[in-house]
Amino acid sequence: MGQKVNPIGLRIGITRGWDSIWFSQSDYKKNLHEDIKIRKFVQNRFNNAGVVKVVIERFPEKINVNLHTAKPGIVIGQKGANIEAVKKILKTMTDKPVNLNIIEVKKPETVAQCIAESIALQIEQRQPFRRVMKQELRRAMRGGVEGIKILISGRLNGADMARRENYKEGRIPLHTLRAKIDLGFKEAKTTFGQIGVKVWTYSGDFIQSKEESEEDKYAVKRRTS
């Protein structure tokens, strides 16, 4: 099961929170489609800015969009010009004022999405894919991750038949729910077609605080008594 399913979706509520923070009974469908449009627009607009995650918070009178990015300077633009332009477009899409909050990713060399985008960009620049994968592998391990796996698939080096290659270092415990597993995906567009890049990173286990563990024990006792 852990080998097939998306590791982020499997661990929501355990090691990772939701990317859409709101509740609605009547407008659920409308809000869901708006969230999808907002994410697509932001990711297309800042395609090369290392956008890792887009968290959307909804309030009765406004919407907060928290943009986690490895390159905040590209997103902000000169004197905040990009932010103001994006705010206007999002306001017309949602009919509500939108606050755009930029959150910088501190160590992009350990974030799966940033690694995948870096590999895809270098493949598009005709760099040898094996060398690129090994470099990113070593950089991530030096950055502090406990395990990393990189998989690329497609017409590698322009071969007639598509194939896949992967490199792995450390361990990736996909079946352990408390493990902090991150997944990144990016497509490299080459003259021979698209090459898919997937990256899994493992950065330790989620450890509960003493208060949370005591609450869990108390809940178990109440159920069994």
UniProtKB/Swiss-Prot annotation:
One of its GO terms (biological process) is translation. GO terms for molecular function: mRNA binding; rRNA binding; structural constituent of ribosome. InterPro entries: KH_dom (IPR004087), KH_dom-like_a/b (IPR015946), KH_dom_type_2 (IPR004044), KH_sf_prok-type (IPR009019), Ribosomal_S3_C_sf (IPR036419), Ribosomal_uS3_bac-typ (IPR005704), Ribosomal_uS3_C (IPR001351), Ribosomal_uS3_CS (IPR018280). Belongs to the universal ribosomal protein uS3 family. Binds the lower part of the 30S subunit head. Binds mRNA in the 70S ribosome, positioning it for translation. HAMAP family: Ribosomal_uS3_B. This is Small ribosomal subunit protein uS3. It comes from Leptospira interrogans serogroup Icterohaemorrhagiae serovar Lai (strain 56601).
